């Protein structure tokens, strides 16, 4: 197996196959569930809006892949600093049956100098998730933070407040995941000594098998080749799947989605 094939198979099994569009429908989510079951293995999860969780759960069970996890988003995509709303949305997502919640960190508040609200928001959402055995990923929106010190600070605050994963981006802003921001975030995980319990998720802009290979190489360099498993690493993407399948000899690499 070539290096690209090997990394593509790894990446496919680490995907949170995503649809977060305003025009999402039950039919589109059902199609996403079908796509998550591939000839070479399943994606780790799907990521959808909360209202579609019941139909996704039913579809995944019917197609014989109940182990594919269901992730959803809260405080999304704006990352406002209203803790009560973020918490209410997170509790609602859990009630819908989410296995994982990707909450947006109040990044604009941090840019304005308020570190406390981010900590408090993540901590509140973590308490709700932990009580239900739900994984919490925190989206820090690196493309808006821009500055390395802010990316580092948002990562540190999220981890201290209990994040199970730190995630680069919503996919809804001009700049999403980059290898540079990925390295900074994973270095924070390393420097804080939390690599056993905190994972990393690049999202938005990871579109090709070659892109995925680059991101995995950074993880391997920092943590060794065994670290990036589904408990410690995810790719938030949709169009990436077609590219990975093509690299693995399935399909033409074309995708209907741009995330």
From Swiss-Prot:
Say if the entry is tagged with keyword Cytoplasm: yes
What EC class does the entry list?
A: lyase
Cellular compartments annotated: Cytoplasm
Output the SMART domains linked to this UniProt entry.
Answer: DeoC
Sorted UniProt keywords: Cytoplasm, Lyase, Schiff base
- Entry-linked Gene3D superfamilies: Aldolase class I
Which biological processes are named by the entry's GO terms? 2-deoxyribose 1-phosphate catabolic process; carbohydrate catabolic process; deoxyribonucleotide catabolic process
Gene Ontology molecular function: any one: deoxyribose-phosphate aldolase activity
| Active-site feature positions | 102, 167, 201
Cross-referenced InterPro entries: Aldolase_TIM, DeoC, DeoC/FbaB/LacD_aldolase, DeoC_typeII
What's its EC?
Answer: 4.1.2.4
Q: Catalytic activity annotated for this protein?
A: 2-deoxy-D-ribose 5-phosphate = D-glyceraldehyde 3-phosphate + acetaldehyde
Q: In which pathway does it act?
A: Carbohydrate degradation; 2-deoxy-D-ribose 1-phosphate degradation; D-glyceraldehyde 3-phosphate and acetaldehyde from 2-deoxy-alpha-D-ribose 1-phosphate: step 2/2
Entry GO terms, CC: cytoplasm
Role of this protein: Catalyzes a reversible aldol reaction between acetaldehyde and D-glyceraldehyde 3-phosphate to generate 2-deoxy-D-ribose 5-phosphate.
Q: Which PANTHER family match?
A: DEOXYRIBOSE-PHOSPHATE ALDOLASE (PTHR10889:SF3)
Family (UniProt): Belongs to the DeoC/FbaB aldolase family. DeoC type 2 subfamily.
Q: What is this protein called?
A: Deoxyribose-phosphate aldolase
User: Could you tell me which species this protein originates from?
Assistant: Escherichia coli O1:K1 / APEC
What's the encoding gene here? deoC
């Amino acid at each position: 197996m070539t290096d690209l094939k090997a990394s593509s198979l790894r990446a496919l099994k680490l995907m949170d196959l995503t649809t977060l569009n305003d025009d999402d429908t039950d039919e589109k989510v059902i199609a996403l569930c079908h796509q998550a079951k591939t000839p070479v293995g399943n994606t780790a999860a799907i990521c959808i809006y909360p209202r579609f969780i019941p139909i996704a759960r039913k579809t995944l069970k019917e197609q014989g892949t109940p182990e594919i996890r269901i992730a959803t988003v809260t405080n999304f995509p704006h990352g406002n600093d209203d803790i009560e709303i973020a918490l209410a949305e997170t509790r609602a997502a859990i009630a819908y049956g989410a296995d994982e919640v990707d909450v947006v960190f109040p990044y604009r508040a941090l840019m304005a100098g308020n570190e406390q609200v981010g900590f408090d928001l993540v901590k509140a959402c973590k308490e709700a998730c932990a009580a239900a055995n739900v994984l919490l990923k925190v989206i820090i929106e690196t493309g808006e933070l821009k500055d390395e010190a802010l990316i580092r600070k948002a990562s540190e605050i999220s981890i201290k407040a209990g994040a199970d994963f730190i995630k680069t981006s919503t996919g809804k802003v001009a700049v999403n995941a980059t290898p540079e921001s990925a390295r900074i975030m994973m270095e924070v995980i390393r420097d804080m000594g939390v690599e056993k319990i905190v994972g990393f998720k690049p999202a938005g802009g990871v579109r090709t098998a070659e892109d995925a290979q680059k991101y995995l190489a950074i993880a391997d360099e920092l943590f060794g080749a065994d670290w990036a498993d589904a408990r410690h690493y995810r790719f938030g993407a949709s169009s990436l799947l077609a590219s990975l399948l093509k690299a693995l000899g399935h399909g033409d690499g074309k995708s209907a989605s741009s995330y």
